[in-house]
A protein has these predicted regions:
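An amphipathic alpha-helix/helix-turn recognition signal
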Residues: 26, 121, 138-142
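Short, surface-exposed acidic/glycine-rich loop or hinge patches that mediate macromolecular interfaces
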Residues: 18, 92, 116, 134-137
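Short alpha-helices
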Residues: 135-152
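Residues that form or flank phosphate/diphosphate-binding pockets in enzymes
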Residues: 22-23, 96, 117, 138-139
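RNA substrate-binding interface of SAM-dependent RNA methyltransferases
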Residues: 1-91, 145, 152-191
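Glycine/charged-rich beta-loop-alpha catalytic/anionic-binding loops adjacent to active sites
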Residues: 9-13, 123-132
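Short beta->alpha connector loops at strand-helix junctions that form conserved
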Residues: 16, 42-43, 129-136
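Internal catalytic-core helix/loop-beta-alpha segment
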Residues: 71-129
Length: 191
């Protein structure tokens, strides 16, 4: 385990060599929405160096993302203990369909790049393999959101997480039923 990197916390998400910063940003938002504490990614195509003023696209508008630790690392699996269960999310023969997938408590979801597949060396770390039942490949960030949403619903249906009322689930103000002071001052017609 490298000391300069954080210890892996499962459940977690690992992106293998993502190509686009906006997909990393949207995956970060999905992690925040579904209570995933860490987003790891490998490769050199997406770099975020706050010292150089680099940030993810739209980061300043992403509410709640600060509860997710961003972890760029070339060997992220080394940071997790033995309880972690790496799950490759990929279109491949003999993989489990997400519809019936039973999510491990300590899952580490592994997603390949936008322009390729998960390399064999990475697949060798994975204990489970799952595919999303869609007619076409999904955008990377969309795939992350779909899997994490399914995880939340599966855990709720199996009594592992409470099914909270919307008022307790949302951590931000949304919807017309709770108008903001700005909307109140403008009126409902925007004037």
């Amino acid at each position: 385990m490298r000391q300069d990197l954080p210890r892996g916390v499962a459940p977690s998400v690992i992106l293998i060599d993502p190509k686009y910063p906006h997909n990393v940003g949207a995956a970060l938002r999905a992690c925040s929405c579904f209570d995933i504490a860490q987003l790891w990614w490998t490769g050199q195509r997406v770099t975020i160096d706050p010292v150089k003023g680099e940030r993810l696209p739209r980061e300043e508008r992403m509410k709640g993302y600060r509860d997710v630790q961003m972890c760029p690392a070339q060997q992220p699996f080394d940071q997790f203990d033995r309880k972690a269960v790496p799950v490759a999310v990929e279109v491949r023969q003999q993989s489990e369909c997400l519809t019936l997938f039973e999510h491990p408590d300590h899952a580490v979801y592994v997603f390949g790049p936008e322009d390729g597949s998960i390399p064999k060396a990475v697949l060798g770390h994975c204990h489970r393999f799952v595919h999303i039942p869609s007619r076409h490949c999904l955008n990377l960030a969309t795939a992350v959101a779909v899997v994490l949403a399914h995880r939340r619903m599966w855990r709720q249906l199996n009594g592992k997480e409470p099914l909270l009322p919307l008022s307790e689930m949302l951590h931000e103000q949304r919807g017309l039923h709770r108008a903001s002071p700005t909307l109140d001052s403008m009126g409902w017609d925007g004037k």
